[in-house]
From Swiss-Prot:
Cross-linked residues, Isoglutamyl lysine isopeptide (Glu-Lys) (interchain with K-? in acceptor proteins): E62
Subunit note: Strongly interacts with the proteasome-associated ATPase ARC through a hydrophobic interface; the interacting region of Pup lies in its C-terminal half. There is one Pup binding site per ARC hexamer ring.
Name this polypeptide is given: Prokaryotic ubiquitin-like protein Pup 2
Domain remarks in the Swiss-Prot or TrEMBL record: The N-terminal unstructured half of Pup provides a signal required to initiate unfolding and degradation by the proteasome but is not needed for pupylation, while the C-terminal helical half of Pup interacts with ARC to target proteins to the proteasome.
Positions of region (ARC ATPase binding): 21-56
Entry's family note: Belongs to the prokaryotic ubiquitin-like protein family.
Transmembrane segments: none
Coiled-coil parts of chain: none
InterPro entries according to UniProt: Ubiquitin-like_Pup (IPR008515)
GO molecular function: proteasome binding; protein tag activity
GO biological process terms held by the UniProt record: modification-dependent protein catabolic process; proteasomal protein catabolic process; protein pupylation
Length: 62
């Protein structure tokens, strides 16, 4: 038994989707924020990795 693909409404199958120009600027900002956060985490780990890991260990079944 052959199944048919559901048809999409709003555009033809041949037509590529419209690019989102505003999304590109946001992606760069998010990438920069992520890089800054990762740099901060690296700094903490370099200074005191053992304490960083201990802060995430559950105590007493919490």
């Amino acid at each position: 038994m052959r199944q048919e693909k559901p048809k999409r409404h709003g555009r033809e199958d041949d037509e590529p989707p419209e690019p989102a120009p505003a999304g590109r600027a946001r992606d760069t900002t998010v990438g920069d924020d992520t890089d800054e956060l990762l740099d901060e985490i690296d700094g903490v780990l370099e200074e005191n990795a053992v304490e960083f890991v201990r802060s995430y260990i559950q105590k007493g079944g919490e």
